[in-house]
Amino acid sequence: MAAHVFPMCERTRKPVHFSETVMEILLREARNGTDPRYENPRGITLLLLLCLVLLLTVWNRHEKKCSIPGPSFCLGLGPLMSYCRFIWMGIGTASNYYNEKYGDMVRVWISGEETLVLSRPSAVYHVLKHSQYTSRFGSKLGLQCIGMHEQGIIFNSNVTLWRKVRTYFAKALTGPGLQRTLEICTMSTNTHLDGLSRLTDAQGHVDVLNLLRCIVVDISNRLFLDVPLNEQNLLFKIHRYFETWQTVLIKPDFYFRLKWLHDKHRNAAQELHDAIEDLIEQKRTELQQAEKLDNLNFTEELIFAQSHGELTAENVRQCVLEMVIAAPDTLSISVFFMLLLLKQNAEVERRILTEIHTVLGDTELQHSHLSQLHVLECFINEALRFHPVVDFSYRRALDDDVIEGFRVPRGTNIILNVGRMHRSEFYPKPADFSLDNFNKPVPSRFFQPFGSGPRSCVGKHIAMVMMKAVLLMVLSRFSVCPEESCTVENIAHTNDLSQQPVEDKHTLSVRFIPRNTHTRNRKA
């Protein structure tokens, strides 16, 4: 037989594919098996082998087509190594690493569970808009440590309870609550700017992030709690709670069995729980002494829900806690990055100041002005695209699904790399900070600073009002001047739950230089 095959190859000089040669030989033998001269089962056996080869070939091609790129399993080393990388580098940094290495759809493992890291716009949008991804993932023991396991709204994966508490958040963050926001933001920002001398050191520097956090926590208190509090003390406890949240979110179970390892984190979480409980008790006492109850705020609504048996005391405390912490470590840092970007882009700052003067003139800021501040809104959107504070979202599939042709089993963890998605080629200058990126309307599938769909950020509208108001008040009264070397690109930062600047004096110290004229009805 070889004498027939190889001379033929020699004469034709054509490449011979192994699978084609095997098929030809098998078919020849199968034909021989049907010849009366060959009464044996060889033909049937070879036909069965042929079918098996074909099935294996098709299966292999199917697997290659339907498997998402990522590190190999390698006898369990792949899951272990990827999990260690997420713990060591932080969730955000590790996700960027895997997307950079394997592409915009990557399969990794966290705590032994298959996890997808998605930055492809169409895939991210698919997950955001479908209700089967309303659950989040994280260590059960870690979430219990910080009070978020099946409580509150941020990481509550009890979908039924999450929907119930979301209605209270939605009521507080829209409607009359949204209408009051602008007035309170203006008043709080101006009050803190009037007292700027108390935060200024001997060299004339101000810790700008501390200032912004004080403004934001004061706004949150006035809107949602409205009780006397010590801003600095509460901010210290919020910061420790946030550090704990980042630390325990994906830690393995054995971490929580080693008491000496996580005692400080558990104590930090408990400190904030106790502080929030004290504030709620203050509000409860006020309600008991009030003669008339009108226009109930967020905390008051929750207290009444608890009294009617709709919510537990623990859930009320966690909801108030999450409402209070949401802005200081997201919105305040977003505004901090925006102030840095303005100093790196002086022409953009000039355009914003001109617009403020044109739209407001000598009048006080009103809701009707906000829709006319097109340059300011464009700047905020570009800042959120170029350097988002929260650039990842965490989901878990509640049902089997198919994303971009790939099968996603129920229970799969999903990390949505929104920050990387925002650098897609849809934008004219995806790698640069430029208002040109928003010269035309951007479809929602390419721009998701607050998410979309059933689990989108419930406070996205109020956040835009707060950012516009705080920026406008600060810029109209002061020129904010950081150190020359302090830019968004070169300041040290971490990226775990969110992008956080490393808080050292050099990074956060800026000068507030009063403007000679400003666009408010206020004397210079």
UniProtKB/Swiss-Prot annotation:
GO terms for molecular function: aromatase activity; heme binding; iron ion binding. Signal peptide: none annotated. GO terms for biological process: female gonad development; lipid metabolic process; response to estradiol. InterPro entries: Cyt_P450, Cyt_P450_CS, Cyt_P450_E_grp-I, Cyt_P450_sf, Cytochrome_P450_Monoox. Heme binds at residue 457. Its main location: membrane. Keywords: Heme, Iron, Lipid metabolism, Membrane, Metal-binding, Monooxygenase, Oxidoreductase. It is found in: Membrane. It comes from the Eukaryota. One of its GO terms (cellular component) is membrane. It holds the Pfam family p450. Its EC number is 1.14.14.14. It catalyses: testosterone + 3 reduced [NADPH--hemoprotein reductase] + 3 O2 = 17beta-estradiol + formate + 3 oxidized [NADPH--hemoprotein reductase] + 4 H2O + 4 H(+); androst-4-ene-3,17-dione + 3 reduced [NADPH--hemoprotein reductase] + 3 O2 = estrone + formate + 3 oxidized [NADPH--hemoprotein reductase] + 4 H2O + 4 H(+). Its cofactor is heme. The keyword Phosphoprotein does not apply. PROSITE patterns: CYTOCHROME_P450. It is a peripheral membrane protein. PANTHER family: AROMATASE, CYTOCHROME P450 FAMILY 4. Catalyzes the formation of aromatic C18 estrogens from C19 androgens. Belongs to the cytochrome P450 family. This is Aromatase. The lineage of its organism: Eukaryota, Metazoa, Chordata, Craniata, Vertebrata.
